[in-house]
Regions:
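TPR/TPR-like (Sel1-like) alpha-helical repeat modules
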Residues: 73, 127-150, 164
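Alpha-helical segment of the N-proximal tetratricopeptide repeat
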Residues: 8-36, 40, 50-57
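Alpha-helical adaptor scaffolds
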Residues: 46-110
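Start-of-helix register in tetratricopeptide repeats
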Residues: 12, 46, 79-83, 117, ...
């Protein structure tokens, strides 16, 4: 095992330990834990992300935002990058930065097309931006893609057709909207 692999294994174990200790009702100890972990692994994008996630869970979105931006700029990869993009997009939405949130979540949707959670959070951001047609279209498409039952399968073409229609309405509204 290489030194980099050993370091990653140690970091992964430490992150798992932090999650095992986490109390969502009292995030201060978790923030302290992940901040200390970041001191051990300075500039490691995964450690940076975990500090951001702890602040986010505590409701301090503004502080979380900076950590998410640093983690992404530091080269976060794989599923951790997907989770970071999702949480960053959600944080931007909570901060009222709807267009930025949609941009980040569309990037995540493009890079991780099989992530249902990204699609749901994109729909939330579209809704928050008063783009309900696009939000419902995303959820209808998700239902058609992921819910397989005789009842849904029977109406899949209608769900997809309605999703396409709603996207058309949203696109028309976006073209008419003042820039």
């Amino acid at each position: 095992m290489s030194s980099a692999d050993e370091t990653q294994a140690e970091l992964d174990a430490a992150i798992s330990e932090g999650y095992a200790r986490r109390d969502r009702d009292n995030m201060a100890p978790t923030i302290e834990y992940f901040t200390a972990l970041l001191a051990q692994y300075p500039d490691h994008p995964q450690a940076i992300y975990e500090v951001g996630g702890a602040y986010d869970t505590a409701g301090d979105e503004q502080r979380a935002r900076g950590f998410y931006e640093r983690a992404l700029a530091g080269g976060l990869q794989g599923d951790t990058r997907r989770r970071c993009l999702l949480q960053y997009g959600s944080t931007l939405r909570n901060l009222g930065l709807f267009d930025e949130s949609i941009t980040v979540l569309r990037e995540a949707r493009s890079d991780y097309p099989d992530s249902d959670s990204v699609r749901v959070f994109l729909a939330l951001s579209l809704h928050a931006a008063s783009r309900s047609d696009a939000a419902v279209a995303e959820l209808l498409s998700l239902a058609a893609d992921r819910i397989h039952s005789p009842d849904i399968d029977r109406y899949e073409p209608a769900l997809r057709g309605n999703a396409d229609y709603l996207r058309t309405l949203d696109a028309s509204a976006q073209e008419r909207a003042p820039q």
